[in-house]
Amino acid sequence: MNESGMTSHEIWNSILNQTPTSMPIMYSNGYTPTNSDGDINPWVASTQCGYNEQWWNNIQTNITLNQKLDFITKGLNFIGRFGFDTDNYNFIKRYKCPALWSADRFRKDDGTINFTRKRAEQEMTQTSGNTGERKEYFEAELQYNRNFKSHILSGTLKYTQDSKVKTQEIGNDIKNSLPMRHQGLAGRIAYNWNYRYFLNFNFGYTGSENFAAGHQFGFFPAYSVAWNIAEEPFVKKNLKWVNMFKVRYSWGKVGNDKMYEANGTTLIRFPYLYTIGYGGAPNIWGDNAGYYSAFGGYNWADYGYEKYGTTLFQGLRYTSYANDGVTWEIATKHDIGLDMSLFDDKFTLTIDYFHEDRKGIFMYRRYLPATAGVENGMTLPQANVGKVLSKGVDGNLAYKQQVGSVQLTMRGNMTLSKNEVKDKDEQNNVYPYLMEQGYRVNQAKGLIALGLFKDYTDIRNSPQQTFGAYQPGDIKYKDVNGDGIISDMDRVAIGATTVPNLIYGMGISAQWKGLDVNLHFQGAGKSSFFINGSGVRPFVNGSKGNILKDVVAGRWISRDESGTESTENVRAEYPRLSYGGSNNNYQESSFWLRDGSYVRLKTLEIGYTLPKPLVNKMHFNNVRIYLIGTNLLTWSKFKMWDPEMNSSNGAAYPLSKSITVGLNVNL
């Protein structure tokens, strides 16, 4: 894959921060244009600044051995699997940039344009890099399946082990060269009597190299029971239209061994080991022979170090604390469900109520007492201290019906969930609403906006806001704690969570003779997100740039500018325009909170299968012409960009809308 030498982020910024009249694409004399700020126009950024070449190599190898063992006992089977995968990524980036010129305001005496070079040509530079990893997987499984008249028994005993190791870009940290490994034994026993009563038991005994000895293995049992009422004789005799009516309950435990650093993406390896480094920079106090560095660790030198310039010997210190008690994060799950099929399977329904109690969630101990000896700059220890309770409903249904020569199918699915942070390592606060405990995961929090300041009298009669200078037309916030000051102490839960709590879909399919039509809708709800970025904060960096028409039309405007008091609307959609930014207006608050709900026509497919006699004459088995459209329509209260992008500023790559026309021919 090839792309510009400038990143997509830089190109988008070029588009957002310039107007179409800022500069031409190129000057007629071949000069590359820029403005007074030295910016590059989007065309130059995309086509004239080198290129970045990337390629990926992936090899997957799988070997499976399947051996029946009926000579030992009927129904016994052995399966062995081995997998070996390698993934490699490489890039070569060659970057250059032409000299940039701006046209002066005044022409030369002969009438020609006078150009000033703003930046010299940047000659080609080259950088390269690569990443790679190797994965191995081994599995040995014994399966048993046997029917004893009305009794059906099955079982599985499985041994697994896997390994993943980096093969490139491992740096100088020895931990990067060590493989991540798991080893486990799992089993399952399933019994049902006459497809009426069901009983299952599962277990997993899994080990992870990421924990200290004695904490590496976890035992994760599970069981389920079910009763298919439709198989009871009185139902089969009197309610023949009931094909299946199964009620079920399951309970189980699952474990997680993955811990991440504060960025949320980098895995933490071996949290049970201390990390040791040298003491910090010299910080001599008096004429002591040994002294403690401001950054931790003892530094040693001869007496009179400053006077005689003797060598400094740095001592060692802990740079991160260990916790040899860290072990598996465990979720205990309960599920009550119903599976139903009626009218010769024309109507089917599956619905589940789930309840999950997740304990021992990994998190940094950020609020340890000073007596613990944790110093500034040290990596804090992780511990199993978090707890989250989740519950919700999940279901899907379908209905099939023949109407004349038309075959109709309607379907739908929905997941509605809710969670609560029950325990978290956070500091107690006099204002409980500032804590995350008691609220939902990813709960949107911010200030409550009361509108915009109308005038200076309104400002004088309102609590002081501590986020920088403000004036009429700026956002006015609520003093939640009543202390007369608007600060971070006034941030509360507002709106929903930033991740949808409701996800659903619905569709309909129809077939008539050779014509088939399929529609699928996708939706999400119960979510909120904050908007920011240059789209709603024009001129935030004090530079020239584009401005959205909605921002211009919907902003607060002083009567001195408009000539009418009506434009000083305290309920305006946007605050006054400001050059160089306004920290007061850029706080996360209900003013910038938006509803993330949407419904999308995800897929529309129309196809036509040619009649069989015609296809036979063409010496084919089947011919179908089709048209598929994806992401064709979206309905949402939010209109600025696609709410499914999960972006606060719209500067992410959007979902593509596509129409595909195709032909399938089977010979």
Regions found by a protein language model. Give the residues of each.
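Catalytic-site beta-strand/loop segments enriched in glycine and acidic/polar residues
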Residues: 155-163, 198-207, 476-499
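Glycine-rich, aromatic-lined ligand/substrate-binding cores of catalytic
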Residues: 74, 497-532
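Conserved small-residue
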Residues: 261-293, 400-498, 538-540, 548-549, ...
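Extracytoplasmic gating/loop element in the C-terminal half of outer-membrane beta-barrel translocons
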Residues: 44, 524-624
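Extracellular/periplasmic, surface-exposed regions of secreted and cell-surface proteins
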Residues: 1-95, 105-443, 584, 588-667
